[in-house]
Regions:
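The feature captures the beta-strand-to-loop junction immediately N-terminal to the Walker
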Residues: 37-39
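Helix-to-loop junction immediately C-terminal to a conserved catalytic motif
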Residues: 52
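ABC ATPase NBD coupling module
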Residues: 56, 68-88, 113, 117, ...
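Conserved ABC ATPase signature
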Residues: 134-138, 142
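ABC ATPase C-loop
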Residues: 151-152
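Catalytic Walker B motif of ABC-type/P-loop ATPase nucleotide-binding domains
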Residues: 159-163
Length: 237
């Protein structure tokens, strides 16, 4: 029997008076990779922020590893092994690549460390070549690699990637997808948001589509490939 790492039920989340999430149920099992899809403004990032405690839901419940974390601060969610790579990246530009990674390791969960400093550098050879570069000296793609590398240094059980390849050149985007495959093979659960549904569904086990803050589809990648009308209807592709 699989272990449910995230179990969110009946989420209603608002920005001021704007009702964004409308009764969303969302779950993540151990070792599962999930694609979260939807057009712009449909609630994807809001759902991720609700899971992380950044934008607490007004109604509903978020359970992490069986513990009720609804409305708890993000650092408490992170301590339970959930790492969040937000859209727009989040590195310390005045610190070197090495310092960024070392700092993340100190903030990570205790116990066995599957993702060591050496393993991260092996996975991200570009970062290994730029250890003494400041974060602000890196390209957009390298900054994204550093952000993901920092998250892995915390040794998470769940990795959340919001707009994983947004604004990246095709060659760099392919490298990010390669890294996503490595992460999946390592056994980490992942939630991936990205506009490139073809790449997403090559990696994911299950996919969720949001429309106006409601779940309108949940199913396997194979189902989406077999029935393209679902993507056409809800994503316009």
């Amino acid at each position: 029997m699989s272990e449910r790492l995230i179990d969110a039920t009946g989420l209603h989340t608002y920005y001021g008076a704007s009702h964004i999430l409308r009764g969303v149920d969302f779950r993540v099992e151990r070792g599962e990779t999930i694609g979260l899809m939807g057009r712009n403004g449909m609630g994807k990032s809001t759902l991720l922020k609700s899971l992380m405690g950044l934008v607490p839901p007004r109604q509903g419940q978020v359970r992490i590893k069986g513990r009720d974390m609804t409305g708890r601060p993000p650092y408490e969610v992170a301590r339970l092994g959930v790492a969040y790579v937000p859209e727009g990246r989040g590195i310390f530009g005045n610190l070197s690549v090495q310092e960024n990674l070392r700092m993340a390791a100190r903030a990570g969960t205790q116990g066995q460390r599957d993702w060591t400093y050496e393993r991260v550098l092996t996975t991200f050879p570009r970062l290994a070549e730029r250890l003494r570069h400041g974060g602000q000296q890196l390209s957009g793609g390298e900054q994204q690699m550093l952000t993901i590398g920092r998250a892995l240094m915390t040794n998470p059980d769940v990795l959340i990637l919001d707009e994983a390849t947004e604004g990246l050149a095709p060659l760099i985007a392919r490298e990010i997808w390669r890294i996503c495959s490595v992460i999946k093979a390592s056994g980490i659960s992942a939630i991936i948001v990205d506009k490139n549904w073809k790449h997403v569904t090559q990696i994911t086990d299950r996919n969720v589509i949001l429309v106006k803050g409601e779940v309108v589809f949940e199913g396997s990648s194979q189902t989406l490939h077999d029935d393209p009308s679902v993507l056409e209807q809800h994503l316009g592709v």
